[in-house]
A protein has these predicted regions:
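N-terminal "arm"/small-domain region of PLP-dependent enzymes with the aminotransferase-like
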Residues: 16-80, 211
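Conserved PLP-binding catalytic core of the aspartate aminotransferase-like
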Residues: 304-314, 319-354, 364, 369, ...
Length: 402
């Protein structure tokens, strides 16, 4: 097939994106897919020969490069090699996987846990395995794309409720037949805005309407709670979430995703969820690294405490300088710029002063709400955060954002 001779909707979609990317590159405003050549302790990186302060990383507790975690990965490679060469359901399960799942279950205070090859595929396969065409799935309007895709793939009746609007969720639930199976899914920390789901009220509603509750903790592990155990600890609640989802690629410096739940739910997913049955198992190094990372979180509580202090400094300082950071109270800090070109321009000005931030533009966020989605970690020091804020402030004033 000659691409140049094709004239259909597929080519139209392809060329629309190609043209959009080309336009951004022509204006020297393309900052996506930048290769990082060195990770220097989490707070600093080497990009195209320049050392920069990293404010776009999900390594919230600064565990990238942690000696204990690296050592666990190295030992796993020495013992098992670099891959399992099989799916978990058949010949790909190692004792390392079982150990990791036991660690996760203990950390999340559930009976069992199950790991997958990525966080995206975890949401995709779990939601679509739990509900089907005669069921209902309720999703916060700002949930992660993986949740949305899982809802769509499930074939269930897909109902979206206004962002963190529990009254609107109650209204939606009340419209559904009482005997229908219902699953409510929400992020613990919303990845674009940094705000936190109203867990106490959503739990109350799920009990009232006999609905299952699934919470995505991708951005809350290590971030929320006195010891970093997540959304339930943050609100002083225990075992109120039926299905606890998380990733192994943000606070945990590895790759993969997990579900922590009851023994029955995990047994069901182990034998039904297609991404578990038909995907390769986590490589030994990644499983061992993730397992050790959970232990480090518990052994080094100062990291969670420092992250909390750094977050307060960063959000407070940006607000004092006149920036709109929406309703965030976590390490994800949106710096609202307005139009897409303003976000690109603020990114360029910041990176020119060695502050590595990245833009988020439409359609990932609504038009007119383009932003820098900055993140702060436990690896940052106070003076580094102050410098970053000063750089963004200077650029923001020149661009008329503040």
């Amino acid at each position: 097939m000659d691409f140049k001779e094709i004239d259909d909707s597929v080519k139209s979609r392809v060329m629309a994106m190609v043209d959009r990317v080309a336009g951004i590159k022509e204006n020297d405003l393309y900052y996506f897919n930048q290769p990082v050549s060195e990770l220097r302790g989490g707070a600093r990186v080497l990009v195209r020969g320049r050392e920069m302060g990293m404010y776009a990383s999900y390594s919230y507790l600064g565990l990238v490069g942690h000696e204990r975690i690296n050592e666990a990965a190295i030992k796993a490679v020495e013992k098992y090699g670099t891959g399992t060469h099989g799916v978990r359901f058949l010949a790909g399960s190692l004792d390392l996987h079982e150990e990791l799942e036991n660690t996760i279950a203990e950390f999340k205070k559930t009976e069992a846990a199950l790991t997958y090859s990525s966080g995206y595929v975890t949401n995709l396969t779990v939601v679509s395995s739990l509900v089907g065409r005669h069921d209902y799935v309720f999703s916060d309007k700002l949930n992660h794309a993986s949740i949305v895709d899982g809802c769509l793939m499930s074939g269930a009746k897909f109902v979206r409720f206004r962002h963190n609007d529990i009254d609107n969720l109650a209204h939606r639930l009340a419209q559904v037949p009482k005997d229908a199976a219902k699953l409510v899914v929400a992020d613990a920390v919303f990845s674009m805005d940094g705000d936190i789901i109203d867990l106490p009220r959503i739990v109350e509603l799920c009990k009232e309407f006999n609905a299952w509750l699934m919470i995505d903790e991708a951005h809350s592990i290590g971030v929320l709670g006195d010891t970093g155990k997540g959304i339930e600890e943050h609100f002083g609640m225990e075992n109120v979430v039926d299905i606890k989802m998380g990733t192994l690629s943000k606070t945990i410096p590895s790759v993969g995703g997990y579900i922590a739940s009851s023994e029955e739910v995990i047994t069901y997913l182990r034998h039904v969820s297609r991404a578990y049955i038909f995907s390769a198992a986590l490589p030994p190094a990644q499983a061992a690294a993730a397992n050790e990372a959970f232990r480090v979180i518990l052994d080094e509580p100062w990291r969670t405490e420092k992250l909390r202090a750094n977050t307060e400094q960063f959000i407070g300082g940006l607000k004092q300088r006149g920036f709109d950071t929406l309703l965030t109270e976590t390490a994800i800090v949106p710096i609202v710029c307005g139009e897409d070109d303003m976000a690109y321009s603020l990114t360029r000005a910041s990176q020119e002063k060695d502050i590595f931030v990245l833009p988020v533009v439409s359609p990932a966020v609504p038009e007119g709400m383009a932003r820098l989605r900055a993140t702060v970690t436990a690896a940052h020091e106070q003076d580094e955060i102050e410098y970053a804020m000063n750089v963004v402030e200077e650029a923001g004033k020149k661009l008329g954002i503040i």
